[in-house]
Amino acid sequence: MESENNSVKSKSISRKKKIHNNSNDLEIDPKVTPINVSELEQIQRDQLIVIAEEKAVDFAENLSKQELIYNILKKQSEKNGAIIAGGVLTVVEDGFGFLRSNKLVPGPSDVYVSQSQIRKLGLRSGDYVVGLVRSPKDQEKYYGLLRVERVNDMTSEEAKRRPNFEDLTPIFPDEKITLETDKPNDSLSQRIVDIFSPVGKGQRALIVSPPKAGKTMLLKSIANGITSNNKDVHLMVLLIGERPEEVTDMRRSVEGEVIASTFDEPVEDHTRVTEVALERAKRLVEAGTDVVILMDSVTRLARAYNL
């Protein structure tokens, strides 16, 4: 996605690209391999140490994972190499925003997005934005977004033409979501839901049962049925107040996007993550994607809003 206030010029002498963004100039050397921040965050610490040593980072073995990423990006900036970052946009009350990829909560790897970029490109909370960023300057806390490449896997012009979620017309469900699969561990519960309580696209459903009755197991079974039989559906599993090990188990069991705020995190994170996840789903619907949100649990979310 291209930002209209960014222009790219080439110099035949230095063979570098000069990018202008809000009066900030950055020299990009095409000979230096670009680094993707999101990919670095997925790499294990041992592999990061190898990359850091290749970048000549001092005392790499003594650094934490977050410190390794920071120093790798710092060395990349010193060599005028491109840094690519992506995350879900959160717009604050003052009009500017942040790209967040780590559990959708504030963190040191957030990318600052200016108010002018948000207005000019029509960005909204919940957009997944990928772009070129720069390292923090003196007395700055966050990376800065220089140029937007993609928004929800669309170009900037395509993103500008998308409708608003509030302007879409709600209709009754007219397409069934089939859950039954050939997996023996899941097929019985999936078939029972298909027969006695069929679910359609656009429908809301609530699972009510006492504690320890197997709601989470049923939720995983439903999630696997959705991903197996409905490849065009984007599945989001939202876990609020769960134990960290249950979140890990869900991520290993389900192919969809798992978003979580565990019980040991502040209640403010519970509400913030829920609201950002809902905005993320709206942006996907605006792009023409069918979205299913499975949340566990409504009780803990209501408790978080009441505290």
Question: What is the predicted role of each segment?
Answer:
Residues 104, 117, 133-139, 211-212:
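Short, charged beta-turn/beta-strand-edge "cap" motif at the junction between a beta-strand
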Residues 171-172, 177-274:
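Phosphate-binding glycine-rich loops and their immediate beta-loop-alpha structural context
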Residues 123, 134-207:
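P-loop NTP-binding catalytic core
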Residues 1-113:
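Charged, low-complexity terminal tails
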Residues 67-69, 80-95, 135, 139-152, ...:
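Glycine/charge-rich, flexible interdomain linkers and switch-proximal surface loops
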Residues 48, 68, 97, 114, ...:
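Residue-level signature of catalytic and energy-coupling elements of molecular machines
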Residues 117-130:
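Short nucleic-acid-contacting surface segments enriched for D/E, G, S/T with interspersed K/R
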Residues 252-259, 263, 267-307:
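Conserved P-loop NTPase nucleotide-binding/switch module
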